[in-house]
């Protein structure tokens, strides 16, 4: 099989979900009713759902079987200890708090780290800034509602869709240290390393870059949180592209990666393959006070610290999913599926970011150059794609990035991208071919696609619930 151009899916499909086909007229009415926002479409009106890979894919038979072991005790569940043991074995982190999903972890750790910096280092809340290679939208949102400005420090290659670079998710290390010096180290409550960098196109971060970033953080005594949603995909790219680690296993690379952070926050709905679940973990006793305070907040916001909003069966499933998501054959297939879609789109003249781990990212700015950034070209493209083929995708651009919370002005976005997110073990190569064909039709009508303007704009995380209309 090593010499075959394309390998089939490395799994057998045992359960299927029927989907309905709709007419163009039906879809046009549905997208207008949604306020030109695919987030607000009903799932039954979607033919191929590429909105997200978060909790939308299939689970393995071992994960499903593990649910039968669930201990639903309110306190001290043995299912919690099974999950905590998986975390120790995989990441080397001693303290585990389960949460209902990634943002559950964020709403706990962010205020705790800000408070710690304020008490121990005299942080000035009016000047505080957190840094990342690129903040995920909810991490940015939770930071901002806690009064913390966020600053993304990424390399110049990150958003240039015309450039191929092995690790486009890397930190701009000089920019990071310069930024810390500018705002004052004591005013930096945390650094977030996002692996892979979702907003840059699912692009990986090298181990060398993570090591250097962590060295800078230790120099200024700033805690590092690893945003770990796609930890296994990042490890796979390291194995493929960082020569020093080509003979390492995914498990070995993962363990090494997590030496270069102090905490991890995870939406387990991605690489751990579960429909619902998250993690907040602390590496060792150096931040035991943070762990203790986070446990206290967990009780109020998520649930008792040994279940954190998850049933026992869900914790058992997650304990297994963390391992299953690191399977090398599975990762090779998943990355190849994304590459196949990107290659097919580029063959028909649709410019994409280089293939990342979980999605194809179409450069909407280049496909729709007549639509200015403040009329959201990638959102307009998402609506057109749905009208043409019933495919739901998501904007990663100015619409998502939002406004400066202090000035109210639209934040400048480095690229206007449309993310075609591939749920795990859900769609076949035939689906990828259909998506490519749909873009042929979209491309033919590109000049007639109109920009969008708000009819309703929430103040925080607007892209989830905003409504728009054509200009």
From Swiss-Prot:
Stated EC number for the protein is 4.1.99.1
- Keywords from the named record: Acetylation, Lyase, Pyridoxal phosphate, Tryptophan catabolism
Q: Which residues carry this modification: N6-(pyridoxal phosphate)lysine?
A: 270
Extract the InterPro entries matched here: ArAA_b-elim_lyase/Thr_aldolase (IPR001597), Beta-eliminating_lyase (IPR011166), PyrdxlP-dep_Trfase (IPR015424), PyrdxlP-dep_Trfase_major (IPR015421), PyrdxlP-dep_Trfase_small (IPR015422), TNase (IPR013440), Tryptophanase_CS (IPR018176)
Q: Which residues carry this modification: N6-acetyllysine?
A: 5, 115, 156, 450
Q: In which pathway does it act?
A: Amino-acid degradation; L-tryptophan degradation via pyruvate pathway; indole and pyruvate from L-tryptophan: step 1/1
What GO MF terms are annotated?
tryptophanase activity
Which cofactors are required for activity?
pyridoxal 5'-phosphate
Reaction(s) catalysed (UniProt annotation): L-tryptophan + H2O = indole + pyruvate + NH4(+)
- Sorted alphabetically, which Gene3D superfamilies does this protein's record hold? Aspartate Aminotransferase, domain 1, Type I PLP-dependent aspartate aminotransferase-like (Major domain)
Q: Which domain of life is it from?
A: Bacteria
User: Does the record bear Ligase in its keywords?
Assistant: no
Q: What class of enzyme is it?
A: lyase
- PANTHER family xrefs: BETA-ELIMINATING LYASE-LIKE PROTEIN-RELATED (PTHR32325), TRYPTOPHANASE (PTHR32325:SF4)
* Protein family per UniProt: Belongs to the beta-eliminating lyase family.
Quaternary state and interactors? Homotetramer.
**NCBIfam families in the record, alphabetically?**
PRK13238.1, tnaA_trp_ase
The name on file for this protein is: Tryptophanase
The species this protein belongs to is: Escherichia fergusonii (strain ATCC 35469 / DSM 13698 / CCUG 18766 / IAM 14443 / JCM 21226 / LMG 7866 / NBRC 102419 / NCTC 12128 / CDC 0568-73)
What lineage, starting at the top, does this entry show? Bacteria, Pseudomonadati, Pseudomonadota, Gammaproteobacteria, Enterobacterales
- Gene expressing this chain: tnaA
